[in-house]
Amino acid sequence: MILDYRILSIGTLAVHELWERQGEHRTAHATTTLVRSGDRRIVVNPGLPTPVIAARLRERAGLCPEDISDVFLTSFLPDHRRGLAIFPDARWLISENERDMVGGLLIEQFEQEQDEQARDLLREDIALLKRFQAAPDCLAPHADLFPVPGFTPGACGLLLSESNRTVLVAGGAVGTSEHLEKGRVLRHSFDVEQAQVSFTEVLEIADVIVPGYDNVILNNLRSHKIFG
């Protein structure tokens, strides 16, 4: 059985809170990852628009959207799911805690919102979230859920267990390489204290980290395990 992962698209924050020079405001989108294990082909966090996701699949993996068996979101944020519509036949998966807790918050906001346009947007998000199944603990051989709450209420990464190392698709639990270097969580986290706990747990378990809005990072705290 071959376990393989690759980055389809490197994400970016709208405003990088740890950069001195910000430049122009960017459209945020999460890093998108393809995981292949057994008979499953899983896209994690399709944050770019559908035409771009389709192009990245072809360029990076020689695949079509129809080849994807599952889509997994580490968090139910718009910048994690812009490309969802291109995978209508795949299973849409999210952690049960994220689905239930975010669903409750969306319903509460909907009931309190007075603006009709805002209510329509909330209604769409609620309907979209209902399409998601609660992800099983094991999505595929050697690809298991790893809860990282804090960035969002039920944020959950995907832990890939290779023969000599662990790779964690961490989502917003680790924002960027700068956040890892400085030991910081994303400023707009839902629960900063809980996010810091999850951040520490990521460092303890992952040899390689796929962050929420950056390229793959080697965890120097555990690199000795890989190289000697």
PLM region descriptions:
Residues 15-32, 37-70:
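Pre-active-site segment of Zn-dependent metallo-hydrolases
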Residues 35, 45, 68, 75, ...:
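Divalent metal-coordination and catalytic microenvironments
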Residues 47-128:
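Active-site HxH/HxHxD metal-binding segment of metal-dependent hydrolases
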Residues 7-8, 30-36, 42, 134-163:
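Core dinuclear metal-dependent hydrolase active-site scaffold
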Residues 10-12, 46-48, 76, 97-98, ...:
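Active-site metal-binding loops of divalent metal-dependent hydrolases
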